[in-house]
């Protein structure tokens, strides 16, 4: 006998449960249809959907069994709501989940800091081989540290080294401090609020690493809307995108020990930089996992403190 309600109506059928795997595929289709931009932690719709679905459900990607788990109505609603924010507000998924990975390590991020995505991660994982002898790197500076990901990854890869992490933004340093605590590196990673080298005194380093702002005014205006959620201070650097890099080139030698090195990511301003500084022997590093626009200069190859001058203004 079929059950009926006291009103004489049949009860509404239960909503169909869906597996986590099915929700991920559904989400990926939504993201592709919406033509969102990928590049802030993931480079495809399925990985982005997986990150959002698992976060909405409070599940870990490390457990393969979760993908077959069945999800009820409320869980599906949470997933749809998070995907809707990603699509309608164009918020990068990493800001919605608060979690990203860099050099094999997890980091907390929010809109106070740039989302880590630098190919420098690959250098750190290789301990800068074959270009540098890691055993001689005893003191490192991460200039423009943001979330602290480069500084922390260097400290993990070089457990004998002390690392300074400098940033102009007090808000960024708050995020970096949270990550330093998370990785229990308070005794080895030291945060400094500084406009480039201004607060570092006479400190000298074996290695200075930097992923500074390098986006020019015109390029910034043409970026996908996802970039508008990142701090402009961490992206823009003058009309041609070279303002911050010029400071690094002018002042880095005064903060490097003999035999030290400067490694800087400049993205697609590579050619503009070479035109502006034709006298500098930039070594452009290659990456197995893709990416580019990262140069290395030895301390002795850099101009004397304050002597770096571009060939023409606004180059």
What are these regions (language model features)?
Residues 45, 113, 241:
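Short, conserved glycine- and acidic-residue-centered signature motifs
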């Amino acid at each position: 006998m079929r059950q009926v309600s006291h009103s004489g109506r049949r009860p509404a059928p239960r909503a169909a449960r869906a597996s986590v795997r099915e929700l991920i595929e559904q989400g990926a289709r939504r993201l592709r249809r919406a033509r969102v931009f990928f590049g802030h932690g993931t480079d495809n719709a399925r990985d982005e959907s997986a990150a959002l679905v698992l976060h909405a459900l409070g599940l870990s990607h490390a457990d393969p069994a979760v993908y077959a788990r069945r999800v009820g109505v409320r869980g599906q609603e949470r997933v749809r709501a998070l995907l809707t924010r990603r699509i309608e507000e164009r918020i990068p998924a990493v800001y919605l989940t608060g979690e990203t990975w860099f050099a094999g390590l997890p980091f907390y991020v929010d809109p106070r800091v740039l989302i880590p995505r630098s190919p420098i991660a690959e250098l750190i994982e290789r301990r800068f081989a074959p270009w540098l002898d890691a055993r001689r790197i005893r003191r490192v500076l991460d200039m423009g540290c943001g979330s602290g990901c480069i500084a922390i990854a260097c400290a993990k890869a070089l457990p004998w080294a002390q690392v300074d992490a400098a940033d102009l933004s007090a808000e960024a340093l708050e995020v970096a401090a949270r990550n330093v605590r998370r990785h229990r590196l308070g005794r080895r990673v030291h945060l400094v609020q500084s406009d480039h080298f201004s607060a570092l005194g006479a400190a000298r380093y074996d290695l200075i690493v930097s992923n500074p702002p390098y986006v020019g005014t015109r390029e910034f205006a043409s970026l996908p809307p996802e970039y508008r959620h990142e701090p402009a201070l961490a992206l823009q650097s003058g009309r041609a995108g070279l303002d911050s890099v010029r400071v690094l080139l002018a002042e880095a030698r005064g903060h490097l020990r003999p035999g030290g090195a400067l490694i800087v990511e400049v993205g697609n301003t590579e050619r503009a930089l070479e035109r502006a500084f034709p006298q500098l022997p930039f070594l452009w590093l290659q990456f197995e996992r893709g990416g580019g626009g990262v140069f290395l200069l030895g301390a002795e190859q850099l101009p004397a403190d304050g002597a770096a001058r571009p060939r023409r203004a606004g180059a």
